[in-house]
Amino acid sequence: MTKNHTFRLRWTYIALSAVAGAASASDAVVAQLMTRDLIGMPGKEVTMETVEYAPGGKSPPHRHHAQVFVYVLEGSVRMQVQGSPAVTLSPGGTFYESPDDLHVVSENASQTKPAKFLVVMVKDKAKGAGGQPDESARDRARAP
C-alpha cells in the first residue's frame, strides 16, 4: 500500500468516524485488505475490505460511487439503498450497491453480537476511497 493510499484511507476513516460518531453509538472498523488496478481497464480499480460493527453499530447514509458487493461473514447486518426495502442478511448473505445508489442503512442488526462483512468495490480511481457521507440524507433519516 502506498503512502498516498494510506493517507487517503486514514483521512476518509477520520472523516467518516467524525460523522458516524454524531449519528451512532459506535463506529465501523474498516480493514483495507487489497487494492489493485484492473488490467485492461485504464482508470479502474478494485478494492477489498472488511467492515466490523460492534453490537448496535451503524454508519450514516453515504455514497461509494462504485459497484459494491457485500458478503456477510459473521453476525447479522441490515442494509438498504434509497428507493428499496431494507434487508437483513446473515452469514453467506449478499448485497449489491450501484455507483448511483445512496446507502441509507448499514448497521448491525443485533444489539448483543458483533457483525463482520467483506466488501469488494469496483470503481474509477479518480473517485477516491468512497463512502462519502451524504449530509442531506442523514438529516432526512433523522427527521420525524
Where are the model-predicted features located?
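Short acidic-glycine-tyrosine-enriched beta hairpin
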Residues: 38, 42, 53, 83-100
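Ligand-binding loop in jelly-roll beta-barrel domains
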Residues: 86, 100-127
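N-terminal targeting signals for Sec/Tat export/insertion, comprising classic cleavable signal peptides
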Residues: 34-66, 109
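Extracytoplasmic
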Residues: 43-48, 67, 84, 100, ...
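Glycine- and acidic-residue-biased ligand/ion/polar-headgroup-sensing regions
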Residues: 66-84, 91-93
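Sec/Tat-exported extracytoplasmic proteins
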Residues: 50, 57, 73-76, 81, ...
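A short, N-terminal "cap"/entry segment at the start of jelly-roll beta-barrel domains
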Residues: 2-47, 80, 95-96, 114, ...
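Histidine-centered metal-chelating micro-motifs
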Residues: 58-60, 78, 95-108
